[in-house]
């Protein structure tokens, strides 16, 4: 008994145990379930149990007067005739008789329903259905026992094994039932009248077919779309392509005549190859109504084209570009560049140019718009203005935007025009003036359904970062990330969010953003450059030389294939500073010359020039080259009257040079560092304060500078716990009482930080600068670590630390 129970679904085991007492306590059991859910297995176990208990098992109702030592076990009761079902129902009323019946749950079969009601008077039915299954098997098995068994018993791949088993089982069904399943696997919205109209049968006959289809358990609403598709494909393979097409064509025609066709049904029919003018029109309307959902919009437009729609290629290219399928979008757009329709040709240029910018080829985008020439469509002229400005052609950008709009002033057109006008204002107007216009583009961004070179959120955030307005930058890009943009810009928004956090010293959060942006599919060139540059910046700030080199070379590879534009100056600046650290500036010199020429061609706008010149100051300092620092310092000084950021950077640059000359004025450093933090450069601000602490011989000033660095870091973590939070070591070198180490670890959190940096070979002075503590305090920590570990020498201590920390480092690498 125990062995047989292991094959039985849990829901039926209790009933089988009760059957052992059937000779003295008759039992009535009803088992329902779809195809391959285990009904026959349960009945086999029931027969064995009843026979062991001494009863004679019959497969059909016995004649009247049969001795009570018999039991009825009926399989596939739904196949019995109405007369047989009536007779069986009458025998169920005999309290002396044990009856076990299994059937599909056909609720519209009157005679079967009478039997089930009679059996359920004694106990509720036992319903067999899908079993819990691993996620990777849900789409091919839906948890159905017969498919799970096939997958486990066959040497084929799970999907193939399940497909073969499904086809084998479906071949047992008659053609009308297969036709009904074929239609109902398309959508759950079809009912009896729909099947009747499509198959040309009576409603009564259709009701029976629908009942059988649902009773099969193959089209449950809980099944995944992928499994329903596999059911449909299996039936199509059985009935053949011609019959499949005939049934779906009949369904489409009947649906068009009696009711609106749902988007899901229209999609499936078009994707199965049906061509019909009315179907194409329906899909086109649905696509136009789902512009906010770019992936579904692209699928609908593609299906409409397959169904025979004309003139939708531009809309499809737009939708594909917004989904991030730039290759397909560019291919469609290129095919339309020779279109005789000027409007279609202009839209194709806009799509192709936008994709080119996303792929890091702004030069090609400018060539496309130059070839097109002036065009009155607002979306086209605005996109062209953005491209020409990014490429350094300010005169053409302004001329392009002067064209009178030919189309209606829609919200999308207004958004694009505000974005282009705001961008031009950043070239020669005060930042507040430009941001007021750019802000209007953000307010209507959701109305955009046509692709442009960059998202409004990204361009506004870039302008805010370049202007030293971290509050605005955080707000705009934070909302964009939370709202979830089209796939084309999702990674860009994450990278910009990470960039802001990196500049503010929130390195763990910045790392999380760049990791999220880099996960999954291959990055397009613009995103690849930003991701590699951001990782380079993070590595430089954490002092990870190996990672710095790795990411810098990756960024240089992306940059080598990149057509430099105005919107890539931030990553270029970080690569410049890293190159100076690595003594590799020569490799970047040509690109730097291009960047400076680009800025000159735009009239050296203060907003876009400041960040690159600040990078030049840093690069010159790292290269120990005062003559390299001077021109960038002078450029910043020249822009002080036009830019708050230039004022902060100019003052900070002079202060930094004095600090390096060991001329540390605490008030001056404090003012410069706080100004840097105010413009979003908290990471640079803390480094300036830390550098000042190292360069002064006055312990009091050194302590004040370290405290300043801590204050700046804590003030910009925005809820993220800082690595050194809670530590208050005085600059005098007296170590604080150590915190209790975590359970299982001999080191406190601070000692672990010191140990990790010690293993990197960093001297006490650099460790102190990193952790904003004095070198003397680092020395005390090292002594305490050695004492805690019981190491007899420094080399023994380092060996023990490597043994302790190496496994954790390995785990971290594996996670990455």
Briefly describe each language-model feature range.
Residues 26-28, 243-323, 666, 671-679, ...:
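Extended alpha-helical scaffolding segments used for macromolecular assembly and cargo binding
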Residues 134-168, 202, 209, 218-221, ...:
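Amphipathic alpha-helical "lid/sensor" segments that cap RecA-like P-loop NTPase cores
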Residues 161-162, 187-194, 199, 204-252, ...:
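Short capping/hinge segments at domain boundaries that bridge a core fold to an adjacent linker or tail
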Residues 215, 306, 334-338, 366-374, ...:
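Amphipathic alpha-helical segments of tetratricopeptide repeats
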Residues 660, 730-816:
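Helix-turn-helix DNA-binding segment
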């Amino acid at each position: 008994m125990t062995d047989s129970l292991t094959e039985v679904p849990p829901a039926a085991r209790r009933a089988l145990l009760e059957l052992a007492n059937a000779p003295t306590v008759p039992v009535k059991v009803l088992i329902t379930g779809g195809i391959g859910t285990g009904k026959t297995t349960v009945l086999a176990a029931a027969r064995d149990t009843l026979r062991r208990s001494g009863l004679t098992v019959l497969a059909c109702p016995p004649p009247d007067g049969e001795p009570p030592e018999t039991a009825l076990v009926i399989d596939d009761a739904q196949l019995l005739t109405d007369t047989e079902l009536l007779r069986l129902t009458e025998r169920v009323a005999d309290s002396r008789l044990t009856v076990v019946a299994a059937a599909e749950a056909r609720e519209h079969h009157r005679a079967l329903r009478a039997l089930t009601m009679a059996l359920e008077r004694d106990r509720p039915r036992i319903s067999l259905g899908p079993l819990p299954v691993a996620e990777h098997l849900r789409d091919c098995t839906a948890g159905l026992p017969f498919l799970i068994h096939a997958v486990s018993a066959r040497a084929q791949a799970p999907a193939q094994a399940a497909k073969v088993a499904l086809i084998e089982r479906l071949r047992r069904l008659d053609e009308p039932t297969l036709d009904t399943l074929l239609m109902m696997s398309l959508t759950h919205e079809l009912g009896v009248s729909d099947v009747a109209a499509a198959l040309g049968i009576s409603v009564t006959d259709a009701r029976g077919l629908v009942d059988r289809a649902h009773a099969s358990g193959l089209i449950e609403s809980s099944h995944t779309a992928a499994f329903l598709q596999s059911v449909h494909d299996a039936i199509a393979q059985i009935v053949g392509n011609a019959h499949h097409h005939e049934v779906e064509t009949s369904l489409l025609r009947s649906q068009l005549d009696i009711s609106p066709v749902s988007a899901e049904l229209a999609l499936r029919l078009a994707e199965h190859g049906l061509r019909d003018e009315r179907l194409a029109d329906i899909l086109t309307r649905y696509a136009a109504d789902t512009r906010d959902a770019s992936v579904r919009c692209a699928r609908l437009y593609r299906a409409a084209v397959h169904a025979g729609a004309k003139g939708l290629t531009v809309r499809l290219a737009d939708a594909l570009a917004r989904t991030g399928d730039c290759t397909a979008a560019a291919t469609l757009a290129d095919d339309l560049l020779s279109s005789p329709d000027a409007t279609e040709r202009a839209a194709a240029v806009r799509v192709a140019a936008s994709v080119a910018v996303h792929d890091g080829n702004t030069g090609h985008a400018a060539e496309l718009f130059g070839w097109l020439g002036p065009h009155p469509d607002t979306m086209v002229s605005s996109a062209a203005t953005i491209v020409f400005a990014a490429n350094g052609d300010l005169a053409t950008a302004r001329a392009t935007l002067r064209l009178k709009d030919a189309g209606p002033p829609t919200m999308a057109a207004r958004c694009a025009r505000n974005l282009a006008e705001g961008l031009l204002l950043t070239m020669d107007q005060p930042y507040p003036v430009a941001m007021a216009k750019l802000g209007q583009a953000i307010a209507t961004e959701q109305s955009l359904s046509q692709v442009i070179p960059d998202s409004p959120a990204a361009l506004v955030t870039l302008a805010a970062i370049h202007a030293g307005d971290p509050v605005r930058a955080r707000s705009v890009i934070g909302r964009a990330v939370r709202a979830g943009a089209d796939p084309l810009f999702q990674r860009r928004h994450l990278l910009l969010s990470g960039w802001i956090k990196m500049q503010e010293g929130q390195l763990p959060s910045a790392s999380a953003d760049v990791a999220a942006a880099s996960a999954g599919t291959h990055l397009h060139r613009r995103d690849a450059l930003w991701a590699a540059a951001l990782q380079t910046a993070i590595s430089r700030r954490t002092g990870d030389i190996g990672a710095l080199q790795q990411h810098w070379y990756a960024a240089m590879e992306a940059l080598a294939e990149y057509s430099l534009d105005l919107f890539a100056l931030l990553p270029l600046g970080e690569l410049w500073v890293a190159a100076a650290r690595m003594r590799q500036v020569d490799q970047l010199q040509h690109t730097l010359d291009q960047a400076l020429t680009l800025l000159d061609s735009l009239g050296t706008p203060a907003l876009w020039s400041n960040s690159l010149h600040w990078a030049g100051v840093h690069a010159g300092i790292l290269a120990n080259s005062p003559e390299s620092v001077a021109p960038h310092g002078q450029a910043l000084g020249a822009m002080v009257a036009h830019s708050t950021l230039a004022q902060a950077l100019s003052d900070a640059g002079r202060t930094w040079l004095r600090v390096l000359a060991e001329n540390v004025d605490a008030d001056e450093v404090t003012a410069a560092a706080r100004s840097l933090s105010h413009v979003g450069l908290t990471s640079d601000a803390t480094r300036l304060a830390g550098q000042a602490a190292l360069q002064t011989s006055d312990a009091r000033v050194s302590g004040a500078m370290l405290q300043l660095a801590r204050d700046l870091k804590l003030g910009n973590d925005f809820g993220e716990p800082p690595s050194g939070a809670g530590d208050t070591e005085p600059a005098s070198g007296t170590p604080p009482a150590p915190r209790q180490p975590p359970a299982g670890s001999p080191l406190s959190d601070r000692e672990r930080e010191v140990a990790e940096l010690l293993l990197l070979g960093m001297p006490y002075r650099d460790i102190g600068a990193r952790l904003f503590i004095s070198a003397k305090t680092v020395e005390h920590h090292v002594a305490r670590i050695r004492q805690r570990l019981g190491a007899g020498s420094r080399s023994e201590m380092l060996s023990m630390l490597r043994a302790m920390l190496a496994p954790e480092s390995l785990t971290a690498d594996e996670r990455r």
